[in-house]
UniProtKB/Swiss-Prot annotation:
It comes from Chlorobaculum tepidum (strain ATCC 49652 / DSM 12025 / NBRC 103806 / TLS) (Chlorobium tepidum). One of its GO terms (molecular function) is nucleic acid binding. Transmembrane segments: none annotated. This is UPF0102 protein CT2262. Belongs to the UPF0102 family. It holds the Pfam family UPF0102. Gene3D superfamilies: 3.40.1350.10.
Length: 129
């Protein structure tokens, strides 16, 4: 696993712990539908949340959430449609969230110190904005 992959995987672990501590019920991690992936799928009460996690070691290339481009949003939406097609409830409430993790202190095995921001309803499917 190269450094960016490792950093991303560590950020996803941090995000999953954050969600669990907030009472979310995680139902899938790294869900793949064709070539598209959703980092975390979890229930926040009755709402099914499709969560993209972005992790960076500095703000040199901008805030982590800024890297969730329109193209990436479309990929997430395609994977979400695949996941929803497998469910029995066609009327389930859904939400697309982004969790941004900024690693402030890293050693060879883990991110020691970080900032985390959970952006609920970060984007909407079909949103032209």
């Amino acid at each position: 696993m190269n450094a960016p992959q490792w950093l991303g995987a560590e950020g996803e672990k941090i995000a999953a712990r954050h969600l669990a501590a907030k009472g979310y019920r995680i139902v899938a991690r790294n869900y793949r539908f064709h070539r598209n992936e959703i980092d975390i799928i979890a229930f926040d009460g009755e709402a099914l949340c499709f969560i993209e996690v972005k992790t960076r070691a500095s703000l040199g290339k901008g805030h982590p959430a800024e890297s969730v481009t329109r193209s990436k949003q479309k990929e997430i939406a395609r994977a979400a449609a695949g996941y929803l097609a497998s469910l029995d409830d066609p009327w389930i409430t859904c939400r697309f969230d982004v969790i941004a993790v900024l690693a402030l202190s890293i050693d060879e095995r883990s991110i020691r110190k970080y900032e985390i921001e959970h952006i609920k309803a970060a984007f909407m499917v079909g949103d032209k904005g």
